[in-house]
Design a protein with these regions (language model features):
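Cytosolic catalytic regions of ATP/NTP-dependent phosphoryl-transfer enzymes
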Residues: 1-140
Length: 140
Protein backbone atom coordinates (compact mmCIF):
# COMPACT_ATOMS: atom_id res chain seq x y z
CA UNK A 1 0.00 0.00 0.00
CA UNK A 2 1.36 3.41 -1.04
CA UNK A 3 1.89 5.95 1.76
CA UNK A 4 1.51 9.61 0.82
CA UNK A 5 3.24 12.66 2.21
CA UNK A 6 0.96 15.68 2.03
CA UNK A 7 1.33 19.37 2.80
CA UNK A 8 -1.89 19.28 4.83
CA UNK A 9 -4.42 16.82 6.24
CA UNK A 10 -6.91 18.16 3.67
CA UNK A 11 -4.63 17.19 0.79
CA UNK A 12 -4.07 13.72 2.22
CA UNK A 13 -7.84 13.24 2.61
CA UNK A 14 -8.45 14.33 -1.01
CA UNK A 15 -5.77 11.99 -2.38
CA UNK A 16 -7.17 9.09 -0.37
CA UNK A 17 -10.74 9.88 -1.47
CA UNK A 18 -9.68 10.01 -5.13
CA UNK A 19 -8.10 6.58 -4.72
CA UNK A 20 -11.37 5.21 -3.32
CA UNK A 21 -13.07 6.47 -6.50
CA UNK A 22 -10.53 4.76 -8.78
CA UNK A 23 -7.93 7.51 -9.34
CA UNK A 24 -4.60 6.86 -7.66
CA UNK A 25 -1.98 9.60 -7.41
CA UNK A 26 1.37 8.17 -8.53
CA UNK A 27 3.53 11.24 -8.02
CA UNK A 28 5.05 14.10 -9.98
CA UNK A 29 7.79 13.33 -12.47
CA UNK A 30 10.90 15.38 -13.29
CA UNK A 31 8.98 17.27 -16.00
CA UNK A 32 6.24 18.43 -13.58
CA UNK A 33 3.67 15.94 -14.84
CA UNK A 34 1.23 14.75 -12.19
CA UNK A 35 0.75 11.05 -12.81
CA UNK A 36 -2.67 9.60 -11.99
CA UNK A 37 -3.51 5.93 -12.43
CA UNK A 38 -7.08 5.71 -13.71
CA UNK A 39 -8.15 2.28 -12.47
CA UNK A 40 -11.59 2.65 -14.07
CA UNK A 41 -10.33 3.05 -17.66
CA UNK A 42 -7.04 1.27 -16.97
CA UNK A 43 -4.75 4.06 -18.12
CA UNK A 44 -2.08 6.36 -16.73
CA UNK A 45 -3.09 10.02 -16.99
CA UNK A 46 -0.60 12.89 -17.15
CA UNK A 47 -1.55 16.38 -16.07
CA UNK A 48 1.14 18.98 -16.75
CA UNK A 49 1.48 21.15 -13.65
CA UNK A 50 1.76 24.70 -15.00
CA UNK A 51 1.38 26.84 -11.88
CA UNK A 52 0.74 26.53 -8.14
CA UNK A 53 -0.68 29.34 -6.01
CA UNK A 54 -0.09 28.14 -2.47
CA UNK A 55 -2.65 28.54 0.28
CA UNK A 56 -2.30 31.57 2.50
CA UNK A 57 -4.51 33.17 5.14
CA UNK A 58 -5.35 36.12 2.88
CA UNK A 59 -6.54 34.10 -0.14
CA UNK A 60 -8.00 31.26 1.98
CA UNK A 61 -7.59 28.94 -0.97
CA UNK A 62 -4.99 27.05 -2.97
CA UNK A 63 -5.01 26.90 -6.74
CA UNK A 64 -3.24 24.92 -9.40
CA UNK A 65 -3.29 25.31 -13.15
CA UNK A 66 -2.81 22.14 -15.17
CA UNK A 67 -2.92 21.03 -18.77
CA UNK A 68 -5.04 17.89 -18.92
CA UNK A 69 -4.37 14.91 -21.21
CA UNK A 70 -6.61 16.41 -23.92
CA UNK A 71 -4.66 19.70 -23.86
CA UNK A 72 -7.24 21.80 -22.00
CA UNK A 73 -5.91 24.23 -19.40
CA UNK A 74 -7.81 23.93 -16.13
CA UNK A 75 -7.69 26.14 -13.04
CA UNK A 76 -8.52 24.08 -9.94
CA UNK A 77 -9.13 25.64 -6.52
CA UNK A 78 -9.77 24.28 -3.06
CA UNK A 79 -10.62 26.49 -0.17
CA UNK A 80 -13.05 27.88 2.35
CA UNK A 81 -16.69 27.66 1.32
CA UNK A 82 -17.24 31.42 1.60
CA UNK A 83 -14.24 32.23 -0.58
CA UNK A 84 -15.09 29.74 -3.32
CA UNK A 85 -18.82 30.52 -3.35
CA UNK A 86 -18.25 34.25 -3.82
CA UNK A 87 -16.08 33.54 -6.86
CA UNK A 88 -18.56 31.34 -8.70
CA UNK A 89 -19.68 32.49 -12.12
CA UNK A 90 -23.16 33.96 -12.46
CA UNK A 91 -24.25 30.81 -14.29
CA UNK A 92 -23.18 28.71 -11.32
CA UNK A 93 -25.04 30.97 -8.88
CA UNK A 94 -28.42 30.36 -10.49
CA UNK A 95 -30.85 27.69 -9.49
CA UNK A 96 -31.48 25.55 -6.49
CA UNK A 97 -28.01 24.00 -6.26
CA UNK A 98 -26.32 26.94 -4.53
CA UNK A 99 -29.11 27.27 -1.98
CA UNK A 100 -29.09 23.54 -1.25
CA UNK A 101 -25.30 23.56 -0.98
CA UNK A 102 -25.46 26.38 1.57
CA UNK A 103 -28.02 24.37 3.55
CA UNK A 104 -25.56 21.46 3.72
CA UNK A 105 -22.69 23.76 4.74
CA UNK A 106 -24.83 25.21 7.53
CA UNK A 107 -25.87 21.74 8.67
CA UNK A 108 -22.26 20.53 8.76
CA UNK A 109 -21.20 23.65 10.68
CA UNK A 110 -23.89 22.99 13.30
CA UNK A 111 -22.39 19.52 13.74
CA UNK A 112 -18.94 21.04 14.22
CA UNK A 113 -17.66 19.84 10.86
CA UNK A 114 -15.47 21.88 8.56
CA UNK A 115 -16.15 22.09 4.85
CA UNK A 116 -13.76 22.44 1.96
CA UNK A 117 -14.93 23.43 -1.50
CA UNK A 118 -13.42 22.38 -4.80
CA UNK A 119 -13.96 24.32 -8.01
CA UNK A 120 -12.55 24.28 -11.51
CA UNK A 121 -12.67 26.38 -14.63
CA UNK A 122 -11.35 25.74 -18.11
CA UNK A 123 -9.32 28.71 -19.35
CA UNK A 124 -8.22 29.34 -22.90
CA UNK A 125 -4.58 29.54 -23.96
CA UNK A 126 -4.65 33.32 -24.44
CA UNK A 127 -6.11 33.99 -20.99
CA UNK A 128 -3.57 31.65 -19.42
CA UNK A 129 -0.61 33.26 -21.22
CA UNK A 130 -1.76 36.72 -20.12
CA UNK A 131 -2.23 35.63 -16.49
CA UNK A 132 1.07 33.72 -16.42
CA UNK A 133 3.02 36.72 -17.76
CA UNK A 134 1.54 38.90 -15.01
CA UNK A 135 2.25 36.26 -12.36
CA UNK A 136 5.87 35.87 -13.47
CA UNK A 137 6.36 39.66 -13.53
CA UNK A 138 4.94 39.91 -10.00
CA UNK A 139 7.56 37.42 -8.76
CA UNK A 140 10.42 39.67 -9.88
Amino acid sequence: MRKYNAASPDELALVNAAKQFGYEFQGIDEEDNMLIQDHINKQLLQFKLLNVCEFNSTRKRMSVIVRDPSGKIILMCKGADSVIMERLSQRSRNGDVLSKTQDYVDEYAEEGLRTLFLAERVIDEEEYERWNAEAQAAKL
